[in-house]
Amino acid sequence: MFPMVTEFMNYGQQTVRAARYIGQGFTITLSHANRLPVTIQYPYEKLITSERFRGRIHFEFDKCIACEVCVRVCPIDLPVVDWKLETDIRKKRLLNYSIDFGICIFCGNCVEYCPTNCLSMTEEYELSTYDRHELNYNQIALGRLPMSIIDDYTIRTILNLPETKT
């Protein structure tokens, strides 16, 4: 009998419900206003990477037995392993080992399946260059010890930031 009255009440309930939802969203927004910013000034400040971070691959030439397991488990067949069979001792002698980080997807399969643990992931992630051919690392470049971000005093990490008085 009074469809207009019920529609008006329904409209009023919808208005109240919409105002409540807007209020809930606004309170969430205001609760985040008290938090400190997460942004860092990248070249001058760096975050400390986690233990399981997959950065540049470190290679130990003396441990490698040239078994080519890393090549077989790599989804893109990336590591290039050159070896020569020594007939007198019946073992492979590693001549060259290289990885092109311009193609590498940093999946970590080579590190995980290496039987001699000659490969390991480091925390280095700054591999950018102006020439893509510089990203092809041979065994000498891969054997370079990783520089820890924490030990670098020219870079302010989150642990080394000066305390601010609030």
Swiss-Prot record:
Give the enzyme's main class according to its UniProt record, as a single word: translocase
Q: What are the names of the required cofactors? A: [4Fe-4S] cluster
Q: What is the lineage of its organism?
A: Eukaryota, Viridiplantae, Streptophyta, Embryophyta, Tracheophyta
Q: Name one GO biological process term.
A: photosynthesis, light reaction
Please state what the protein is called: NAD(P)H-quinone oxidoreductase subunit I, chloroplastic
The reaction(s) catalysed by this protein are: a plastoquinone + NADH + (n+1) H(+)(in) = a plastoquinol + NAD(+) + n H(+)(out); a plastoquinone + NADPH + (n+1) H(+)(in) = a plastoquinol + NADP(+) + n H(+)(out)
GO MF terms on file? 4 iron, 4 sulfur cluster binding; iron ion binding; NADH dehydrogenase (ubiquinone) activity; quinone binding
Superkingdom as given in the UniProt entry: Eukaryota
User: InterPro entries given for it?
Assistant: 4Fe4S_Fe-S-bd, 4Fe4S_Fe_S_CS, NADH_quinone_OxRdtase_chainI, NDHI
Question: Cellular component per GO?
Answer: chloroplast thylakoid membrane
Q: Which gene encodes it?
A: ndhI
Keyword Oxidoreductase included in the entry's annotation: no
Explain how, and how many, cofactor molecules are bound: Binds 2 [4Fe-4S] clusters per subunit.
Sites where the protein binds [4Fe-4S] cluster 2: 74, 104, 107, 110
**What is this protein for, i.e. what is its function?**
NDH shuttles electrons from NAD(P)H:plastoquinone, via FMN and iron-sulfur (Fe-S) centers, to quinones in the photosynthetic chain and possibly in a chloroplast respiratory chain. The immediate electron acceptor for the enzyme in this species is believed to be plastoquinone. Couples the redox reaction to proton translocation, and thus conserves the redox energy in a proton gradient.
Q: Which organism is it from?
A: Acanthospermum australe
